[in-house]
Design a protein with these regions (language model features):
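Short, solvent-exposed, polar/charged sequence segments at loop or secondary-structure edges
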Residues: 79-136
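A structural "domain/chain start" motif
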Residues: 14-96, 170, 196-199
């Protein structure tokens, strides 16, 4: 796969937004064959590790997977390149068939999912960070400033071959934007790069 790296650093009088994105494209894949896609809820791991009292921590909102999946679906729908199945329609269709998005995340049986939704490819993702990063003091108080951090990966997978068509890695931080605003900016800029490379 061909890889593109994009680094952004926006400075203003009151804040700095750091953005790093990696874009991987499978150059050998016949991209024109992908016409209709569906975005399923991104995987949000449960971190059961106990961290040091003095180590930096980043919270992950429990609904981060659904939020980022919806943002990604909306951004892809703007392209006009794909027919994107509405996120609500995906949820309702799977519910009618007594299926859950979580089941496909664990089994990665995208062929069955593709048949159920009538799509050529599915967009899957994994959330690694989505919230505020802080370093606790021994007293239990937080050190300032608090920094919003988001980090996640997105992959477009062919439902027939399970082959990755393209993938992006998005990571960023901000001292002023909340996780939703920051994610929206990151997705918009990263997918603009992806669109350019695919055309």
């Amino acid at each position: 796969m061909k890889k593109y790296a994009v680094l952004f650093l926006l400075l203003s009088s009151c804040a700095a937004i750091n953005k790093v994105s990696d874009v991987d494209i499978n150059e050998n894949f016949p991209h024109d064959e992908i016409q209709k896609i569906a975005v399923i809820m991104f995987e949000t791991p449960v971190d059961e590790k106990k961290s040091s009292m003095f180590s930096s921590k980043t919270s992950i909102a429990p609904d981060a997977g659904a939020i980022l999946a919806s943002m990604t679906a909306r951004e892809l729908a703007k392209w006009g390149k794909y027919v994107v199945v509405n996120r609500q329609a995906v949820e309702e269709e799977l519910k009618l068939k007594n299926l859950k998005e979580d089941d496909f995340l664990h089994t990665q049986n995208y062929l069955n999912l593709g048949k159920q939704l009538g799509v050529d490819a599915v967009i899957v993702g994994r959330v690694e960070g989505f919230g505020v990063s802080y370093k606790p003091k021994s007293t239990g108080m937080f050190l300032s400033p608090l920094v919003t951090k988001v980090s996640f990966t997105v992959r477009c997978v062919d439902v027939t071959t399970n082959e990755t068509i393209w993938a992006v890695k998005i990571k960023g931080s901000s001292t002023t934007d909340n996780e939703r605003v920051l994610s929206s900016k990151l997705i918009s800029e990263t997918f603009a790069t992806l669109k350019t490379k695919l055309n």
